[in-house]
Structures are given as C-alpha cells and as structure tokens.
From Swiss-Prot:
It catalyses: L-glutamyl-tRNA(Gln) + L-glutamine + ATP + H2O = L-glutaminyl-tRNA(Gln) + L-glutamate + ADP + phosphate + H(+). This is Glutamyl-tRNA(Gln) amidotransferase subunit E. Keywords: ATP-binding, Ligase, Nucleotide-binding, Protein biosynthesis. GO terms for molecular function: aminoacyl-tRNA ligase activity; ATP binding; glutaminyl-tRNA synthase (glutamine-hydrolyzing) activity. InterPro entries: Asn/Gln-tRNA_amidoTrfase_suB/E, Asn/Gln-tRNA_Trfase_suB/E_cat, Asn/Gln_tRNA_amidoTrase-B-like, GAD-like_sf, GAD_dom, GatB_C_1, GatB_Yqey_C_2, GatE. SUPFAM superfamilies: GAD domain-like (SSF55261), GatB/YqeY motif (SSF89095), Glutamine synthetase/guanido kinase (SSF55931). One of its GO terms (cellular component) is cytoplasm. Belongs to the GatB/GatE family. GatE subfamily. The keyword Nucleotide-binding applies. The keyword Glycoprotein does not apply. It comes from Caldivirga maquilingensis (strain ATCC 700844 / DSM 13496 / JCM 10307 / IC-167).
Length: 625
C-alpha cells in the first residue's frame, strides 16, 4: 500500500467521544440504568415517519431511514423501562448528578459553560429511539484540553440519552431492547486536528481516560464509543460512526484518507476521459434471457424465484468500477453500499469483476453486445420498484464521482475499512424540546460539580511515577479499567506493599485475561492475596499463579483452596535455608546457579529475598571456614 503524506494531504480529524455515565437513574426518567439479558416482560411494534421541523424542512438522513420502510419491535422490562421510553409520557426533569458530571468534565477541559442549557430533540428515525428523536443538551463549548504534548480544541460538551440496543434484524423488522434507552451519556466533540493517526488515537484515549477519572462512568462493551470526522484538503468531511476499539482508529483514518485520495483520482480520470454525468440514466434493460442456461448459482436462484436480471449502462467506466479505494473495497463496492442501504437488494455485479460468480465470458460478451457499451452493472431481484430504486441510487452515486468525495456518514468495520450508512444530517435535524424548561446554570450548581472534576490523565501518570512506578507501568495503569481499584489497594496497604507490585497485578496479571471482574469478584481476590503477602504467607509468584487459576475456574473456588491444592504457601526461612545447605553440600556453590535451581524447583513457594539471604549466609560461612 502507498504510504500517505498526511501533512501534504491536509488531513484533518475530529473526534466524538461518547461515554455512558454510571448514575442512579436514567437521564429523563427514574428507571434504573441497567442492561438486561433475561427474557423481556413485553414487546411493542412501531413504525416511524419523518415530519417537517418547525422550519418546514425534513432532515435528509431521517427521510433516508424512512424510505427503508422498516418496522420496529421494542423489547421492554418492567424494572428498567417506563412510559417515558415508550414515548407515552413526557420526560422528567434531567438527572442532576448527570448534569453535575457534564459540568465537571467541562471544567477539566476548560470549556465555556452556557448560562442556560436547553434540551434539544435530535431527529433519529433508525428506530433506536421510540420517539423518533434523541434528547441532548449542549452544556459547554470552546474549550481547550492540554495534556502531554497535545493541545486539543474542544468544540462542544453535551449530555444526552443513549439509544436503544439493536438486537437483531428479522427481514423488514428490526428488534431493539429498551434497557439502554435513556442511560446518560457525555459526548465530547473536538475541533479538527492535524495530528497523524497514531496521535489521534492517543488523544481519544486521553479524553476518554480523563472522563473515566470522574469515577462515575460505566464499563464494558459499548460503554465507550468513538466517532471520527475525517477530511483531506480536496476531499470532504466524512463521519465514521462506531469505531469499536481505540487501536482501530489509526487504521480507519488511514483507510478513509486513502479512500478520499482514490476518489479524487477517479474524478480526474472521469474528466480525462471526457465523460459527462448526463451520460448516466437509471434506465434498466432486462437481460434475463442471456442467462437462460447460466451456471451461476446466484443468477439461477433469482430466475427460479421469478426474478429478473437487469442491466444498467455504465459507459466509459471500464477500469473505474473495479478501481480499489481501500483494501478489498472498490468503486463498485461504493455503488453496492448504496443499493443495500436504500433497497432490500443484496448488492450488484459489475463488468470489471466479470467473468466471475459463475457468470461466463460468453454471457458477459452477450450483455455488452446487447447494451452497446464497454461497461455495465447487473442487478437481480423481483421486477418492480426495488430494481428501479437501485438503478436510481447507483446513477446518483456515479454522478457524485464527478465532484470527487461526497459528504456522508459511514460505519467502521473491524478491518478498518468503512461502508456507507446514510447521508450527512442537515440543520433541520435539531430543534428544541417542548416538554422541558431551560436549565439555568447557577453558581450553586457549578460549585456542586467541583467534587466530580476529574484528575487530568497526565497528572495521574506523574502521581504514579512519584510512587516509584516506571513511566510505562504508570501509563498502563492509568489506561487500565482497574486503576481505581488499584489505587484503593495501594492506599490500603501503604508502606506494606510496593505500589509497583499492586500496579503490575492489575496491568500484567489481570489486564489481559478478558474476564468480567465484577462477576469474578477479582478485586476481593487480589485484596485477600495482598493480605496474605503482607503477612508473609504467600510470594509474589504465588499471587500470579493463584489469580490465573481462579480466573480459569471462573471463580469456582476460594483463594485458600487454590493455594492448598497447588502447594503455594510460602516456605519458612528455615526450610529455604535447609534446601540451600543441601545443594551447597552437594557441590553447587555458584550463587547464580543456586538461585536459578531453587527459584525453578520451588517457584511460587519461596521468596527470592529469603533465597538470596540464605545463599549469602552459607557461602560466607563456608569461605570463612
């Protein structure tokens, strides 16, 4: 792959970091903010339709969702769902603790808090909000986050309700679960930054960790989500939704920049070929007869089910339809994305990838001859509106290619590539909530928020290094989801246990195990092991072995049972001295070799300090004699 010069390209990236808050209630009702994995207590069916805003306009993203003609099924629970989520009751006053947390985050990022905060309705009719809109409040603006070597412009800090969980798609029905709907979220939106992709990832981490230092954020899958706004100098702003992991951010940025570079190359090539957007029309030609004896299972199945094969002329696009934009994704993939997004069809085939899919060279030549063009697109499905709609969106996307990069919202895949989700939302998407009064931000509220103001992440790292941790370990602990628990245990065993040991337990021993610490009570396990360590009953190595066994067993047995079975109780000094004496008497007199043998044969049961002390004593006495 070509290495991109991001500075020369004029790469700019903005971040939107969303973090769920761990408060006592949902944002606009008094239901518990908990996710459920049991059978729902009830289900309801809804259809959402767009309506004109107060400015007499319809948001294009909302219209796009409506045209998919989806039905929504909502699963609810009596203890975490009420009439507010069902849009059968007005919202309650916003949760004060959530508001205080948003104010605290605004303070740490030096943002200007608005004197008065308005609850707004953001149009969302993908079904994730029963009402058809998400309630959101812009709390502060125009901030500046300074940490490590970065200066990050903070555009807005918002407090909003999370959406319902998408569970599955059943044909034309999408199933959502209402337990997550209404859980408070803080959204931090940055201005465009010109840092390279790896630095953008670090900035996202710094923002997220700083918010988590309020100690009022949720954990687990989906608790933190990142969106990216990416553009290059001659391209367009593209919003990439739902980057699942921080580590994927650099790859998503790289691939989106590459995609925009290649779309600009296509624009230039279209002009060089003297092509005109007027040459492309959504007129379909039925070419089913060409495939009467086809060996393609895809085509054969369509015809057997009563469908047709329709061809769309794409004059002059030979080599362009198959032009790679991102690894494994071509311009034809962009067209297929639009078809899948706007219709129920599964995609398309184009002449640059044929012969293929079981379609023969002769069939390709026959279609080209019938159409009288060098390149074409094939669509398959029931004859009617779906095929016509697919042809229209394909032609629209081809015409957009003459302008270069279209503004759109895309979704991130696990390999870092992206696909089309929907058009970029317009200004009509947001309008005031009519059921709630504005919130006056008083000095009293600002003072109450002070207790939630989080410690900046760079200050946290400095504090850890002052405890004797290496900078790398301090950084790892600061980025660990267990940093709060580690600090509590460091404080509990102050002057008795080296903070570096506590940090390494959480970073190196637990950090990579991928288990839910709440379910396994792992904090209590570490606490018990540190207590035994302080009392001289277990070694550092035994702590690691016991934790590993405990996690492997899913917490089935207690700490002392595991230690008993593994014979991991720490040997008394007299036992260690006896082992050392025996080895020396048998001719092993090299200090390094003695240490190696004993630590290998009695791993987890002997403390290295006891071994070293005994070796020094016996070797010293032997030299004197």
């Amino acid at each position: 792959m070509v290495k991109l010069d991001y500075r020369a390209l004029g790469l700019k990236v903005g971040l939107e970091i969303h973090i769920q808050l761990d408060t006592g209630r949902k944002l606009f009702c008094h239901c518990k903010p908990e996710l459920k994995n049991t059978e729902p207590d009830f289900r309801i069916i809804r259809r959402l339709r767009p309506a004109m805003s107060e400015l007499s306009s319809i948001d294009p993203a909302a219209l796009w969702e409506f045209r998919k003609m989806k039905t929504m099924m909502y699963e609810g629970f009596n203890d975490v769902t009420c009439l507010v989520e069902l849009d059968e009751e007005p919202p309650h006053e916003p949760d004060e603790e959530s508001l205080l947390l948003a104010l605290a985050v605004s303070k740490v990022f030096n943002a200007k808090v608005f004197d008065e905060v308005y609850v707004m309705r953001k149009v969302v009719i993908d079904g994730s909000n029963v009402s058809g809109f998400q309630r959101t409040m812009v709390i502060a603006h125009d901030g500046l986050a300074e940490f490590l070597n970065y200066k990050v412009p903070i555009w807005t800090i918002s407090l909003e309700e999370d959406a319902a969980r998408r569970i599955e798609d059943k044909g034309d029905v999408t199933v959502y679960r209402l337990d997550r709907l209404g859980i408070p979220l803080i959204e931090v939106s940055t201005g465009p930054m010109e840092y390279p992709p790896n630095s953008i990832m670090e900035v996202a981490w710094l923002i997220g960790r700083t918010i988590m230092n309020t100690r009022r954020t949720k954990r687990g899958l989906g608790a933190i989500r990142q969106d990216l706004n990416i553009s290059i100098a001659k391209g367009a702003k593209t919003e990439v939704k739902g980057v699942p992991e921080l580590s994927l951010i650099p790859k998503v940025i790289e691939y989106e920049a590459l995609r925009q570079v290649n779309l600009l190359k296509i624009k230039d090539e279209l002009n060089n070929r003297g092509l005109s957007r007027e040459s492309y029309t959504p007129d379909l030609i039925d070419v089913t007869s060409v495939f009467s004896s086809t060996k393609s299972s895809i085509v054969k199945r369509t015809i057997n089910e009563g469908g047709i094969v329709a061809a769309l002329k794409a004059p002059g696009l030979r080599g362009i339809l198959g032009f790679e934009l991102q690894p494994g994704r071509r311009f034809g993939s962009e067209l297929a994305d639009r078809v899948r997004a706007w219709t129920r069809l599964g995609g398309l085939m184009h002449s640059d990838e044929l012969p293929g899919y079981g379609i023969s060279k002769e069939e390709v030549a026959a279609v080209a001859s019938r159409l009288g063009v060098d390149s074409f697109i094939l669509l398959m499905g029931p004859q009617g509106v779906e095929l016509q709609e697919a042809a229209k969106v394909i032609v629209d996307r081809i015409k957009e290619a003459f302008d270069g990069v279209p503004e759109e919202t895309r979704a991130a895949k696990e390999d870092g590539t992206t696909y089309f989700m929907r058009p970029r939302p317009g200004a009509a998407r947001m309008y005031p909530e009519t059921d709630l009064r504005p919130i006056r931000i008083t000095f009293e509220l600002l003072a109450k928020a002070d207790k939630y103001v989080p410690e900046p992440i760079d200050k946290q790292i400095e504090r850890y290094t002052s405890m004797g941790m290496s900078r790398e370990l301090a950084r790892q602990l600061a980025s660990s989801e267990y940093s709060i628990e580690a600090e509590e245990l460091i404080k509990k065993y102050e002057d008795k246990v080296n903070p570096t040991l506590v940090a390494s337990i959480f970073v190196n021993m637990i950090g990579g195990m991928g288990k839910n610490i709440e379910q396994l009570n792992i904090i209590q396990v570490v606490d018990k092991l540190l207590e035994l360590y302080v009392n001289g009953r277990v070694t550092r190595e035994a702590i690691q072995d016991t934790i590993q066994k405990y996690v492997e067993e899913g917490g089935r047995r207690g700490v002392e049972d595991i230690i008993n079975e593994g014979g991991l109780w720490r040997m008394q000094y007299s036992e260690v001295a006896s082992i050392v004496k025996s080895l020396i008497n048998n001719g092993v007199k090299d200090k390094g070799k003695l240490m190696s043998i004993i630590m290998r044969d009695y791993r987890g049961r002997v403390d290295s300090r006891d071994v070293e002390k005994a070796i020094n004593e016996f070797l010293s006495s032997e030299q004197k004699s």
